[in-house]
């Protein structure tokens, strides 16, 4: 087996860059895209909001509990936003090491698809937060917007956790 392929994402694109560990998304992928007219931080807003939801739902990794305890506390107190946590604690790279096992399983269901491309999260983010904005990148990094997308993420998470949604098609006869 070789080095795994990094699954970096941005809406509408797939990047296959070699890396030592799996990345789900990186803000720097979007620095030379339509996000250019905005400050660079805007490229990490969508990642930070998802990561904040994961932390606030106890899905952060032991790595962050050990190495980012102060930042985790500030995020939980809403002294910083998810994007600010992402920039400071993750060096603008959302990877497997950021979440615990359950968090990574959910990411692989919702944030990325089976091919390692953008998952349903991106459609939810656009529908909930960016539908009336000039672009995906114009979403303001604030707790009001976080609350809106957090409700959508939580719904998807509960659907994913439900035994019925995890049932295989050949198990159609099972009631739960």
Listing of model-derived features with the role each one plays in the protein:
Residues 59-63, 95, 99, 116, ...:
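Intrinsically disordered or highly flexible coil/loop and linker segments, enriched in small
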Residues 20-85:
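N-terminal low-complexity, intrinsically disordered segments
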Residues 1-21:
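N-terminal amphipathic/basic-hydrophobic helices that include classical n-h-c signal peptides
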Residues 165-176:
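Polybasic, Ser/Thr-rich amphipathic helices
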Residues 35-37, 146-149, 153-157:
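Polar/charged low-complexity regulatory segments
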Residues 8-11, 15, 122, 155, ...:
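Compositionally biased, intrinsically disordered low-complexity regions
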Residues 79-148:
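Amphipathic protein-protein interaction modules
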């Amino acid at each position: 087996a070789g080095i795994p392929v990094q699954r970096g994402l941005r809406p509408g694109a797939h990047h296959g860059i070699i890396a030592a560990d799996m990345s789900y998304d990186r803000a720097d992928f979007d620095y030379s895209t339509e996000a250019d007219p905005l400050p660079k931080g805007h490229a990490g807003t969508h990642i930070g909001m998802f990561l904040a939801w994961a932390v606030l739902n106890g899905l952060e990794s032991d790595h962050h509990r050990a190495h980012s305890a102060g930042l985790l506390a500030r995020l939980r107190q809403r002294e910083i936003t998810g994007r600010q946590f992402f920039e400071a604690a993750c060096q603008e790279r959302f990877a497997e090491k950021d979440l615990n096992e359950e968090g990574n399983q959910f990411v692989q269901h919702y944030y990325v698809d089976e091919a390692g491309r953008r998952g349903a999260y991106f459609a939810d983010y656009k529908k909930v937060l960016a539908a009336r904005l000039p672009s995906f990148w114009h979403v303001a990094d604030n707790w009001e917007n976080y609350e809106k997308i957090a409700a959508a993420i939580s719904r998807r998470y509960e659907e994913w956790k439900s035994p019925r949604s995890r049932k295989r098609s050949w198990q159609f006869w099972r009631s739960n």
